[in-house]
Amino acid sequence: MAILKAAKDCFWKYGINKVTVEEICEKAGVSKMTYYRNFANKKVVAVMVLKDIISKSEQLYDEIMSKEIEFPNKIKEVIVLEHEYSRGISQEFIQDVTNNEDEELQQLLVEANKKGQQKFIHHMKEAQKEGWVRKDLHFPFLIHMMNDINIKLKDEKLIAMYDSIEDLIMELVNFFFYGIVSHEKLK
């Protein structure tokens, strides 16, 4: 639907809070009457947009992880996916989503994060059995570090070190998977 696409584009660029229903309608090429016939308010649209983003990213992650390729190549593809999904994202969007006090939105994020972590840990354990992941890796530590990445996305001092939130996201993802070792040398 044009309204949801327009809303996603606007939210991605300016955040949820700064975008008005009028701006969404203008970008979608619809009247406010059409908007309100379909959606009660901006929050409903924001939740639908986030559900769609989460669903699509889960689907793409699952497709990558089900491929018949070696684990390091799967990780490379996941990193490319992260890069694609973070392209053009604004700091405002990240802040609006992570600092939002709306209960439904928070529950959506908590559930998506939990589900994503469970899938990821499952795949890491499988890779561990195949010898791709250190045998001594403590998975609760890994989960803690994954949660810490979300906290880092709110760190104003850290954010200020990068030209864009997209650059910071990629730095965090690469650091998480590769540490400080050149992944070129790991080949």
Could you say what each language-model-derived stretch is?
Residues 1-27:
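Short, amphipathic alpha-helix enriched in basic
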Residues 12-16, 29, 36-48:
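HTH DNA-binding helix-turn interface
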Residues 48, 52, 61-88, 143-146:
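Hydrophobic alpha-helical connector segments
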Residues 56, 67, 78-89, 130, ...:
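Phosphate/oxyanion-binding loops and surfaces in catalytic or ligand/nucleic-acid-binding neighborhoods
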Residues 64, 93-101, 153, 157-158:
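Secondary-structure edge/capping motif, primarily at the C-terminal ends of alpha-helices
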Residues 72-73, 111-113, 129-145, 163-167, ...:
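All-alpha amphipathic helical-bundle segments outside canonical DNA-binding/catalytic cores
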Residues 80-121, 132:
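Short secondary-structure transition hinges
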Residues 118, 122-130, 147-149, 155, ...:
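C-terminal peripheral helix-coil segments that are non-catalytic and often amphipathic
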